[in-house]
Amino acid sequence: MHQLTLAEIARGLADKSFSSEELTGALLARIQQLDPQLNSFISVTEELALGQARAADARRAAGETGALLGAPIAHKDLFCTNGVRTSCGSKMLDNFKAPYDATVVAKLAEAGMVTLGKTNMDEFAMGSANESSHYGAVKNPWNLEHVPGGSSGGSAAAVAARLLPATTGTDTGGSIRQPAALTNLTGLKPTYGRVSRWGMIAYASSLDQGGPLARTAEDCALLLQGMAGFDAKDSTSIDEPVPDYSANLNASLQGLRIGLPKEYFGAGLDPRIAELVQASVKELEKLGAVVKEISLPNMQHAIPAYYVIAPAEASSNLSRFDGVRFGYRCDEPKDLTDLYKRSRGEGFGAEVQRRIMVGTYALSAGYYDAYYVKAQQIRRLIKNDFMAAFEGVDLILGPTTPNPAWKLGAKSSDPVAAYLEDVYTITANLAGLPGLSMPAGFVDGLPVGVQLLAPYFQEGRLLNVAHRYQQVTDWHTRAPNGF
């Protein structure tokens, strides 16, 4: 059963080939057996899952239908889950049990999904390798000596290893798309405001967006259907009707205009990945797409702008973790200042502390205009570049990452080397655009992804193109050895 996609599970539950309880039991046993090799889960919620599975079976027996009813899910451990630890991958929240469910968690539970657990992640979603977690690094199922990408590395590794068919992730600078590329999955970052951020522990509030990780575009469409929608509790949620994401998966690509930004194919890109990107372009041309070269002239400024804006927002968001109300508190503080200093110094890991300090510096009185304001101006230029490009093309295509997955620890001593792995994904967050990564082949036995970007609220078009591509290629069907 573990080989089934989310869509196949939906069909199997509908025609009573198996029950949700049987499926849940089988997947929980698989997690117990295989996850020690991967470390993809922080918490496994066995009792909760079996209870939800029985409830889903009862709802189905009473005549209820629904693609997600009784299907399994695991949540990245920054979505609040009522009564279940929500750690954000940090010592700071090791003992935090949220008193409520995040909107995404509540919506999927209402649809009847069964929560198998909470997945490992970079601490406070800060990282591209899932090595900064307080609970240890996650291993890539394609090669256990390599990273799975981050920050949604646990969500990606669990799906790639067939521990379950789909998971939730979040994407602030590529944290859904980059691990999807490095583990042979399909991952979608929706338009900013499409999926509620309420109950999602914030890293950078103007960039964070939740989305699905699965093996196929068809599965991402099903999961996004359950996640998307307006939420009055999130002031940045956008009241835009939610289309049926599965309805147009098979639509023709005849005449679809795809732009290849020349800036994506310069220095830093592994030439073997460039070849795989060109091969995927040829497949889309066979399906009727028209491809042309475009330019995104300000792209080279994206990483510096992002690493001012995101840490600045993080330094503000993470100020609430002070050892007073909830979360980690140091032992026997001498006074209030000592409580703050030691609780934060002991509770946050090195990468989180680094970003808080960078952000605090960028927001300080003498540097605010030179750094933060300048970064926001660059952000506007990057958005304008996309708006201009989309006047002449329907979608933008390029590599998801410049390199395949690297070895565990290889970039730990040089944070900037890891930051550069997000060079192609960051721009979509700065502009708020939807982006999707899909499997496009292998380099040295490690998966490679191709990224598609679309205008606002065009998630359906991204899923359509990825689905048509997956009908004529088989990269997405390949599984890692031993899983």
From Swiss-Prot:
This is Glutamyl-tRNA(Gln) amidotransferase subunit A. Belongs to the amidase family. GatA subfamily. Heterotrimer of A, B and C subunits. The keyword Transport does not apply. SUPFAM superfamilies: Amidase signature (AS) enzymes. It is an enzyme of class 6 (ligase). Keywords: ATP-binding, Ligase, Nucleotide-binding, Protein biosynthesis. NCBIfam families: gatA (TIGR00132). It comes from the Bacteria. The active site is at residues 76, 151, 175. Gene3D superfamilies: Amidase signature (AS) domain (3.90.1300.10). GO terms for cellular component: glutamyl-tRNA(Gln) amidotransferase complex. Allows the formation of correctly charged Gln-tRNA(Gln) through the transamidation of misacylated Glu-tRNA(Gln) in organisms which lack glutaminyl-tRNA synthetase. The reaction takes place in the presence of glutamine and ATP through an activated gamma-phospho-Glu-tRNA(Gln). Its EC number is 6.3.5.7. GO terms for molecular function: ATP binding; glutaminyl-tRNA synthase (glutamine-hydrolyzing) activity. PROSITE patterns: AMIDASES. One of its GO terms (biological process) is translation. Pfam families: Amidase (PF01425). InterPro entries: Amidase (IPR000120), Amidase_CS (IPR020556), Amidase_dom (IPR023631), AS_sf (IPR036928), GatA (IPR004412).
